[in-house]
Amino acid sequence: MPGIEIDVACLRRLGNLPGHAQLGDSVLAPHVESAVSEVLAILGARVPRNEAEEGRVRLAMGCFAMANALPVLNTFYLSQAEKVPRQVALTDYVFHDAGELLKLAAYWKNRGYEALREVGRTGGTVGVSVI
């Protein structure tokens, strides 16, 4: 499914992340690349049938990238702790404890899976044999 991918700017918009000056593209790019590969592997032979489904694939890629980037983003805020009060005023992202981080990552993964649910489905039935 060549041609369907996202970039760091898409991830910044989706997650309302800080700009390049506060959070460099090099921090987010590996997570975007990983998410694109992960979503394409999940889809396998399924191909989006229209523009709306392509948008859902891109949304899933962004959601997976957010889930993958959360630990790094949390570390970014921890390492910048003395600057956090000023930065919190500039962004919606805040520091999370370990439990919150796991829940938030699961939320983003589930949102991504939900976006992929109907992509490339024909609406037919599937037969299963139990032996």
Regions found by a protein language model. Give the residues of each.
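Conserved short "hinge" loops at termini or chain/domain junctions
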Residues: 1-58, 107-131
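Short loop/turn elements at secondary-structure junctions
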Residues: 2, 68-131
